[in-house]
Structures are given as C-alpha cells and as structure tokens.
Curated annotation (Swiss-Prot):
Domain of life: Eukaryota
Lineage: Eukaryota, Fungi, Dikarya, Basidiomycota, Agaricomycotina
GO biological process, one term: proteolysis
Protein name per the record: Alkaline protease Cc3
Disulfide bridge positions per record: none
Amino acid sequence: GLTDQKSAPPGL
C-alpha cells in the first residue's frame, strides 16, 4: 500500500 515500509509487512 501507500504506507508500505521496507522493514514491515505490506500495508503497514
């Protein structure tokens, strides 16, 4: 998602 982080699961 738009808030995806490289060190977190997609969408978080």
